[in-house]
Design a protein with these regions (language model features):
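Solvent-exposed, extracytoplasmic
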Residues: 106-121, 193-236
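Extracytoplasmic/periplasmic sensor domains and loops in membrane signaling proteins
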Residues: 107-111, 140-171, 234-263
């Protein structure tokens, strides 16, 4: 009896052998489940990656557009501040000439012009005083020859105002982009124009080096003529958007003509424009779209890598 009882216990402890058909059935069921769940999982992962990429791209694009607009605003403020500062200096010189008696004393006037010659490097050649006969007074150290003074833009514009203001941009004899600040002197006995020429080199420096957004670039355009006044690419300066064969610049010209200051995407660049107060100038700032989305592209690559690893683990575990 004891022997039979022991045998019964041993029989109970023995695992029943699976029938080959049962084993095949279970493997087939697992394969079917995996065949259904794996595609669904892959679709879900792809959808999640696409959603994450889209949301991240929109957020980064929005943030970058705001940063580009801020950068253009800061540059525009710097250009306007420079123009206002130089114009204030011209007004100070005008006030000094009028209230020191220099407008009625030729010797004192000549001395003043000599003193102001080295006032500021931005004032190319110092200051000029031109009468209605076309006679020009200038600093003794200024060797520039001025012919047909009455035909010069600074003379013609100066006749229209007492308070000094800027002329449109013009090229000097050496093909440098210049502007003049000019206005009539307060002299009851003689009509005379006070003027000075300013180089746009300082403006060019602001346009090229004061971009706060990494990877962004700017150029300054005269809206009335389409001429490029400042650019990091020196070969573009003094060329016209109206004559360009560059597709991007053509689209920029259209944007300027429409007075469109919104942030827009032109070809492969995000672009914003800003008008410079008191001038016909428009600052154009732009950044490659690829530079903005590069961080999102890196995130997408990481997500895809994680997804692939996760799918492999999921497949192996099932």
């Amino acid at each position: 009896m004891k022997k039979n009882t022991k045998q019964t216990k041993d029989d109970k402890m023995k695992k029943p052998k699976q029938h080959p058909k049962q084993k095949g059935f279970r493997m087939g069921l697992r394969a079917k489940i995996l065949g259904i769940s794996l595609p669904i999982t892959i679709i879900m992962v792809i959808a999640m990656i696409a959603i994450a990429y889209s949301v991240s791209e929109k957020d980064i694009m929005k943030s970058s557009q705001s940063l580009l607009r801020t950068s253009a605003k800061d540059q525009g403020n710097q250009i306007e501040a420079w123009l206002n500062r130089k114009l204030d200096e011209v007004k100070t010189v005008k006030y000094d000439l009028e209230h020191s008696g220099a407008v009625k004393d030729q010797k004192l006037l000549q001395k003043k012009l000599n003193d102001y010659y080295a006032l500021d490097d931005s004032f190319v050649g110092g200051f000029y005083v031109t009468d209605t006969a076309g006679t020009v007074m200038k600093a003794d150290d200024n060797t520039t020859q001025i012919n047909n003074a009455k035909d010069q833009i600074w003379y013609q514009k100066g006749l229209t105002r007492m308070n000094p203001g800027y002329t449109p941009v013009f090229e000097d004899a050496e093909n440098h982009m210049m502007i003049s600040a000019c206005g009539m002197l307060d002299d009851a006995t003689n009509i005379r124009i006070l003027s000075t020429n300013l180089s746009l080199d300082s403006v060019n420096i602001i346009v090229n080096s004061s971009v706060s957004m990494q990877g962004a670039e700017s150029l300054l355009v005269d809206k009335s003529t389409g001429d490029i006044l400042a650019s990091r690419e020196s070969e573009l300066i003094a060329t016209s958007l109206k004559d360009t064969s560059n597709g991007f610049l053509k689209n920029v010209a259209d944007k300027i003509n429409k007075d469109d200051e919104s942030v827009t995407t032109i070809r492969d660049k995000v672009v914003v424009t800003r008008e410079i107060a008191g001038t016909d100038w428009v600052l154009v700032s732009y950044v490659p779209t690829s530079l903005i989305t590069s961080e999102v592209d890196n995130l997408r690559t990481i997500l895809i890598g994680v997804a692939i690893v996760g799918l492999l683990v999921f497949t192996l575990l099932n």
